[in-house]
């Protein structure tokens, strides 16, 4: 028994010195890195205020787009808040199709969910009021808490600068 173990260890040492082991690599083969910012162009691309500032300027020049207490110490539910935010953003983007002028700001104050948006006035005011009530009522039913939407209407998309 001991002789067979010695033979196996000698065999393994021969293979390990020859470099015959295979390993699994979990990194991407192309190794491309992309910065989280808008690329510089010819100066003909309009940018909003949120797009013009880089991500490291959050809390200095621009604010967070989602305000909640899920990331505080000993507070749970941060992952659930992110999923809720993604659902709310997609739902409102689909409901008010081609009317959003800028990103949504989602605030949670106690049990109330407040959604702030800047929209382009492409629809009649009566249709905006209907979609506003529809969105508030449906999201209140989904999340079992009061939902309030604060809208600001503009004539056209507000351009901060061109890049």
From Swiss-Prot:
Keywords linked to the UniProt accession: Mitochondrion, Ribonucleoprotein, Ribosomal protein, Transit peptide
GO molecular function: structural constituent of ribosome
Subunit and interaction comment: Component of the mitochondrial ribosome small subunit (28S) which comprises a 12S rRNA and about 30 distinct proteins.
CC annotations in GO: mitochondrial small ribosomal subunit
Compartment(s): Mitochondrion
PANTHER family: MITOCHONDRIAL 28S RIBOSOMAL PROTEIN S24, SMALL RIBOSOMAL SUBUNIT PROTEIN US3M
Superkingdom of this protein's organism: Eukaryota
One biological process term in Gene Ontology: mitochondrial translation
Family named by the database record: Belongs to the universal ribosomal protein uS3 family.
Main localization (coarse): mitochondrion
Transit peptide endpoints, chain numbering: 1-31
Protein name per Swiss-Prot or TrEMBL: Small ribosomal subunit protein uS3m
Biological classification of the source: Eukaryota, Metazoa, Chordata, Craniata, Vertebrata
Species name: Danio rerio (Zebrafish)
Transmembrane intervals: none
Pfam families named in the record: MRP-S24
């Amino acid at each position: 028994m001991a002789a067979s173990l010695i033979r196996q260890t000698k065999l393994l040492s021969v293979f390990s010195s020859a470099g015959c082991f295979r390993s699994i690599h979990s990194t991407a083969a192309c190794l491309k890195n992309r910065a989280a910012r808008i690329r510089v162009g010819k100066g003909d691309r309009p940018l909003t205020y949120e797009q013009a500032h880089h991500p490291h300027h959050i809390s200095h020049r621009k604010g967070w787009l989602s305000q909640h207490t899920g990331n505080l110490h000993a507070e749970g539910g941060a992952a659930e808040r992110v999923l809720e935010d993604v659902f709310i953003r997609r739902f409102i983007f689909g409901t008010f199709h081609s009317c959003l002028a800028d990103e949504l700001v989602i605030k949670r104050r106690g049990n109330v969910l407040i959604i702030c948006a800047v929209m382009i006035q492409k629809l009649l005011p009566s249709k905006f009021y209907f979609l506003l009530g529809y969105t508030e009522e449906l999201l209140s039913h989904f999340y079992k808490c009061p939902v309030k939407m604060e809208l600001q209407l503009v004539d056209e998309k507000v351009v901060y600068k061109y890049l």
